[in-house]
Amino acid sequence: MATNKRDQLIETAERLFYREGYHATGIDRILAESGVAKMTLYKHFKSKEELILAVLERRHQLMFERLRERANKLPPREALLAVFDGLHTMIHGSEQYCGCLFVNAAAEYHDNEHSIHRRSSANKAELQAYLRELLERLAAPQPQQLARQLQYLLEGALSMAHLEGPGEQARDAKDAAQVLLKGAGI
């Protein structure tokens, strides 16, 4: 629950951007649903793009807080596999699963140099670095390559859940991840 007007705007915008898309959601709709005045919005954000970046940053921070929390509580192999469990929970936890907020943003802002596309790409790069870090703690051979392969499984599960609707995508990806880890001697 939002504790201030800025957070209220970000939460409302995130919900609308996720369900309806970035370009399809106008500032007036965000203001109407958040109950925040236009002047307040522009006090906190110079533009819609700045609001989108704040939404992506908030989601990124929450995601990595959860990942790091798990990594601190679990051995590295279990923490790696817990990412797939978290993905399953995320896919099944929303009323209407609409894919990955970051992939959706990159799709709508497809220019690789656009700040929104770059922020989305940075999220994926940080996820890969997180996976690599856990693999390095396990002394995995070729940790960068294995991190990419695990990420492809995660991204594939996200995409297929968006296309097919929530199902067993994350659990199937977790099974494939276990095969990859076993093949790497982990």
Q: What kind of feature is each model-predicted range?
A:
Residues 48, 55, 59-63, 83, ...:
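Hydrophobic/aromatic residues within well-ordered alpha-helical segments
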Residues 1-4, 185-186:
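N-terminal intrinsically disordered/low-complexity leader segments
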Residues 8, 12-50:
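Helix-turn-helix
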Residues 91-118:
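Amphipathic alpha-helical segments used for helix-helix packing
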Residues 5-13, 30, 55-59, 63, ...:
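Generic hydrophobic, amphipathic alpha-helix propensity
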Residues 10, 81, 125-128, 132, ...:
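An amphipathic alpha-helix signature
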Residues 54, 68-97, 137, 147-150:
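Hydrophobic alpha-helical connector segments
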Residues 113-122, 137-184:
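Hydrophobic/aromatic-rich alpha-helical bundle segments in the mid-to-C-terminal region
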